[in-house]
């Protein structure tokens, strides 16, 4: 079985986890979800630093899932500054079979979305501002570009877009 990577990146509060879980729900056991927050904050309880312990286990999880499920969803902030090694690993592991999305939202929109989350009291708007990265695109100059998720898109529209993109690539095979 050939697996496809679906990478969802963006700032805190942009909706990455919500979308990843919704896509996983649609595909069920045909999709595995590797969430940066789960590995970093829940399994290891480590700070968001380059090459933290969670990065290694996330790599192992991707390697384990590759070839066992059709879809590997990887979601998180994954800033280029801190996670370039991990991102390079993913791009090399999936040279053809990948969809890369970036949640291109304003800071104000991420704060608004954060207020609807169960974790809204875990960190403040001020903390979010410190973490904020404007358009931290993985391929800023290259022909291979992230597909941008924009502010006005609903959850359903975003999930449908990912599903359609996924099916289009599968049909090409």
Positions of PLM-derived features:
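P-loop (Walker A) phosphate-binding loop of NTP-binding proteins
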Residues: 11
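Hydrophobic anchor at the beta1->P-loop junction of P-loop NTPases
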Residues: 8
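Conserved substrate/cofactor phosphate-moiety recognition/catalytic segment
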Residues: 21-67
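Walker A/P-loop
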Residues: 17
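ATP-binding Walker
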Residues: 14
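Small-molecule kinase domains that catalyze NTP-dependent phosphoryl transfer to phosphate-bearing small molecules
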Residues: 119-161, 169, 173
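Glycine-rich phosphate-binding loop used to anchor ATP phosphates in small-molecule kinases
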Residues: 53-95
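Conserved phosphate-donor/acceptor-positioning beta-strand/loop module used by diverse small-molecule
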Residues: 94-113
């Amino acid at each position: 079985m050939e697996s496809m990577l679906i990478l969802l990146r963006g700032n805190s509060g942009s909706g990455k986890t919500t979308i990843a879980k919704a896509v996983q729900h649609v595909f069920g056991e045909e999709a595995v979800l590797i969430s940066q927050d789960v590995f970093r904050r829940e399994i290891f309880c480590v700070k968001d630093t380059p090459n933290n312990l969670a990065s290694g286990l996330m790599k192992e999880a991707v390697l384990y899932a590759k070839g066992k499920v059709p879809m590997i969803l990887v979601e998180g902030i994954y800033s280029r500054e801190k996670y370039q090694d991990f991102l390079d690993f993913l791009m090399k592991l999936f040279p053809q079979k990948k969809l890369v999305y970036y949640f291109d939202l304003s800071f104000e929109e991420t704060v608004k979305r954060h207020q609807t989350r169960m974790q809204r009291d875990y960190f403040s708007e001020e903390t979010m501002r410190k973490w904020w990265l404007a358009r931290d695109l993985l391929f800023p100059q290259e022909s291979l570009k992230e597909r941008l998720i924009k502010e006005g898109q609903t959850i359903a529209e975003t999930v449908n877009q990912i599903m359609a993109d996924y099916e289009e690539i599968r049909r090409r095979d």
